[in-house]
Amino acid sequence: MNYRELMQKKNVRPYVLMARFGLEKENQRSTREGLLATTDHPTVFGNRSYHPYIQTDFSETQLELITPVANSGTEMLRFLDAIHDVARRSIPEDEMLWPLSMPPQLPTKDEEIKIAKLDQYDAVLYRRYLAKEYGKRKQMVSGIHFNFEYDQALIQQLYDEQSEVTDCKQFKTKVYMKVARNFLRYRWLITYLFGASPVSEDGYFRVYDDQPQEPIRSIRNSTYGYRNHDNVKVSYASLERYLEDIHRMVENGLLSEEKEFYAPVRLRGGKQMSDLPKTGIRYIELRNLDLNPFSRLGIVEDTVDFLHYFMLYLLWTDEKEEADEWVKTGDIFNEQVALGHPHETIKLIAEGDRIFSEMIDMLDALGIRKGKEVVGKYYQQLRNPQDTVSGKMWTIIQENSNSELGNIFGNQYQSMAFERPYQLAGFREMELSTQIFLFDAIQKGLEIEILDEQEQFLKLQHGEHIEYVKNAN
């Protein structure tokens, strides 16, 4: 199927930029001196079993900040900004959010790394299993999961313009399988541009651990990061093959359950992986973004915009090998880039040139003029590795240290959250009373929808209970 032609059809073009975005971001809590926090998850956030925005991941100290689904990257980041304000002002005053993917100095004894104290006992047992199987230290690495969905209106228009597939849900699944394969093939570019875990703190790797020759571009996205064992192999040739392989891995005891399968891209349908045959793929989750320490949110708007155009490119461009070989080549290239020195020119310049040139051609063909500036900015970095995130980090680390970099930015962002203590980042144009109300609602875990910003009209929901609030009363 020629998606390039489909995307240029007159009826499709008005919809090409329509998409839905969501983001999950992990941060370790640390002391203001850069040591792992020893306190429990703050009780001020209420119960983790239902909180829509602030959870814990593997450990008791690892916050997970979750945005609601948004219709633009700007709207998603706006809410992420607000959640950060709430999180930073709610943790103990001698703590901060550690701004790096690699954790701060960890305790010498693994027993002192506390697994998240959750109400659901099966969730605790699962974390204990992960600790035993992969080690606690690898679980302490943090990153960003970027959720992306092509708008249903775009999918429908693409479907209407073709005749090969006769069911829209099947067509949507076909689209996402192609995009997932292309992402796995070309994800080396994301690792190159946004990799940000060049070094680890002393003691992160044990003496007997296999470990990289630091610095590298991204420990987290290399074989030294968190991943399944080598005998776990899953095909992306089709959704059926993907699910069959994972099911077989569970049956053979190579995975404890389906959710243990960990990959740079995850196919999402319902709540469980087993829902996928019924729901089809609704969106995909990109799991290979390191935290950008040069942003108080761990990610900047240009990166979100670039990822949006990159997702369009992955639909636009053809696959050039059989599915499994295509993905395998991507694994090899990604490892090569992840293990490279942050200031070293990569060997994939020619392929990088092709990707960027084709992205610019695509933006021209689809009339997306505003995208060329963002794509051009990152194209400049292809031959200037010192300008990438890991490149800039290494420049600082050489003169100082990794922990100093984390301390400086972590403390700076923590202080910034208190500069306007009665205002809420992302919503500062609203009335002060509404901002204070929103802060409390986010902190306590009420789902929020802004129905009319001019009128200060909000919808709050907890479970089945709904309240409408105007002017914060």
Model feature map: region roles:
Residues M1-A131, K138-S142:
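Terminal catalytic/cofactor-binding subdomain
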Residues M1-I54, E325, T329-N473:
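Sequence termini and other peripheral, non-core segments
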Residues Q8-K9, Q105, K117-K136, M140, ...:
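Loop-rich catalytic cores of soluble enzymes, especially ATP-dependent carboxylate-amine ligases
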Residues L35-L36, L106-P107, I155, N292-R296:
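Flexible loop/turn segments at secondary-structure boundaries
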Residues R78-P92, L158-G195, G298-E322:
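Long, well-ordered alpha-helical scaffolding segments within enzyme catalytic domains
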Residues M96-K109, Y159-E164, A323-G330:
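Short, glycine/acidic-rich hinge or "gate" loops at secondary-structure transitions
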Residues E251-D353:
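Long, well-ordered mid-to-C-terminal structural blocks that present hydrophobic/aromatic surfaces
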